[in-house]
Amino acid sequence: MAKELSRDEYTVCDQCRARKIRCSREKPSCRNCGRLGLQCEWSGQGKKCNQTTLLSHTILGMGSRLEQLETALADTQKSLKRLFDGSSTISPSARCPASPASPSPRLSDKRFPDSIQSAVFTRPLGRFLVDQDRDERCFGPTSLESLMLNIKDELLQSPDTDRHTVKECVLQAQRKIDHLVGQGEEIPIGGKAPPTMPPFAILEAMIEPYFTTTHGHFPIWSKKRFTEMATALRQSAPSERDLASIVCCNNLILMAMSADSPGSHQRESMMSKQTRKTSSIDFDLITGFLTNAKRAVSNIDQLVSPHLVNVQALVSLHIVAQVYLSIGLSETLLALAIRCAKSIGVHQWHAFQGRLSDDDVNERQNLSYCLYMLDKAVCWTAGSSPSIPVSDVHFDPRLVPSENGIPSSLVAKAEMARIEETVYLEIYAVHVQARDENQVRGFAAAIMSKLQVCLTETGVDLDQIQTSLDGSASNLQLAIRYLSVQLLLIWPHKHHPDPMFQQAPEVARMCLKLLLRLWHSPPDQGSQAVFSFFLASLPSLYLYEVLISILCGRGTNRDIDMLQEFVEMLQTITDCRAEASYNRRLYQLSLIVTDVVKARRTQHKRPKPTSEGPTDPYLMSELLSPATTGYSYMNSEVQETYDSRFDGGVFQDPDGSFAPMSSITSTSGELARGSDEFLSQLRSYGKSAPGNEHFDSLAMEALGESVLFWKGVNQGASADSPSVRCDLGERLNYI
């Protein structure tokens, strides 16, 4: 006969056993009961307590507590009334005739609403974390780190965690989330080589694509002024070239090539696995210019003096870091750009009218609006407060997008950013006071009205976009931004009884659906081309809501399918991104949840897993590498993820040289003998090779001239050598 356990010997309380959750086994009250305000009971028999009895006791206990609370509030109200009534009754001898008494405040029933009927809503809180090194970090509520920690907490409450396989996968997922949160630490760097001036041939080839596809989204320079800057660099001696101008030229090339890379990715995704190549000239070029951008970061102290070109260099570096490097570095670069812009009065651009040319004034105006919008994006993604208040920026009420060189979508985006700032100041800021239901409802209604007016003025029909497959990519972006702001508005007040605040999961699903549609849409004036930049600027609440719904068992099969499609899309656009970049971390977080979902499905299909191997063959194969101390993008000792052969060729160090490579034959079966013959082969290849519609004759000429440039800077290798010709020919074949 089994030994009967006494109350003191029984290891699980009745409440935790009834809820099927892990008990901390602390007596007289475990942690779960203490957190939920329940009376921790120990039956001593090891049996599951009766659910009806437990529910009855819970309801009676809550009723008793509510009755005590109402009584205490009523007594407090009476005491306060007596206090105010007593203070208003002043004896005649105590009154001062020179200053008549002001009417005493009278308390009405409206001053003390029933606390049971009127809930109080406070601002959402962030997360405070102390790591193993005792480093303290604070994350805002909308930051990716804070949302990842929320998902980590939710994993243990997800269904089927009592099963061994699912439990192991959940524990592994929590470790992976801890690793993701710890990524992106800035490490001080020592002296490094300054950035090198990129080849002028490539620069000239990229100016027109940038101002055609990317400038409307990030109006950092005017085309006229940038062309003048590039011409001045070409005519000046290497020792006299300005560092900020070099950084601007390098980043323009990088942004233009990055904007075209999603199209290259989609072309590769349409190819079979047998014919798909793992490398392309796009990515090899990007990694070379990205290395040059990292060198600019290492010399950031030379870019903080008050000059307009320094502001432009810092803003372009921020955009590059937003996509390729860590969130922390991106935020730091924008903060430096904002401080430098304020010091030269960029936001008071109207004050320069009459003193500067119209082109210079318009350039400052566009840069001011661009900074304001980027500041609001970082406010949500990094969880920090805005650095540029609307009071510091001059918004022209007569602004017409088609006039004065103003991009068409800039006005709508700036107005949307102003609404985002209002949402932050009224809901997320530190000074926000608690509000009741009516106050929360009234503010939300006012913001929704402003958002609708903003869409109407830009000609965007949200209902039509949601119900049909039509709509331009630019309208899709505005609709996604609209849904994102709506989610920021209602997400902190999920427990509000108004139906509007219960729509967060539906809004998040629609936002994810439109994002996937934008990804698959054809290029539309560059809107699809800058998809990576756009995705990195969105707060990740949409993904958080979808992941939470799936983990809690409320997600549908369509949600899981969209998540899988989202993972594939992120994998496509983050192949050459740093592990700590924003989009790459979105990809890794989505993979973690996908692993947990797959483990659940596998467990349900095979309740008795065999011991021959792991039950789930899909356990984050890309995240199973040994954990590191964090991504150190500024550490000179860290191995950078780029093709060293290309970096040694384009941005040649003094002691660098081309690595030996195998030869590649021409179309005739023989190696090209000279540079002229090789250049003609490049041009003919650009015209005949399939899928090379983006590499026109100008681009081919730029690549050919770059061979001559590399020959001049590479001192130890000839441009006619087989290694140089083979490298370029191989990359062209990989397009």
UniProtKB/Swiss-Prot annotation:
Q: Is the Transcription regulation keyword given for this protein?
A: yes
Segment forming the signal sequence? none
What GO MF annotations does this protein's record show?
Answer: DNA binding; DNA-binding transcription factor activity, RNA polymerase II-specific; zinc ion binding
Q: Where is the composition biased (Low complexity)?
A: 91-106
Q: Where in the cell is it found?
A: Nucleus
Region (Disordered) location = 89-110
Q: Mostly located where?
A: nucleus
Mutant lacking the gene: phenotype: Completely abolishes the production of sphingofungins.
What are the alphabetically sorted keywords of the record? DNA-binding, Metal-binding, Nucleus, Transcription, Transcription regulation
**Mind listing where the DNA-binding region sits, in residue ranges?**
13-40
Per the record, its GO cellular-component terms are:
nucleus
GO BP terms: DNA-templated transcription
Q: How is it used?
A: The sphingofungins A, B, C, and D, show a limited antifungal spectrum of activity but are especially effective against Cryptococcus species, fungal pathogens causing opportunistic infections in human.
Job of this protein: Transcription factor that regulates the expression of the gene cluster that mediates the biosynthesis of sphingofungins, bioactive molecules acting as sphingolipid inhibitors via inhibiting serine palmitoyl transferase (SPT).
Q: What is this protein called?
A: Transcription factor sphG
Say which species the protein is native to: Aspergillus fumigatus (strain CBS 144.89 / FGSC A1163 / CEA10) (Neosartorya fumigata)
Taxonomic lineage of this organism?
Eukaryota, Fungi, Dikarya, Ascomycota, Pezizomycotina
The gene coding this protein: sphG
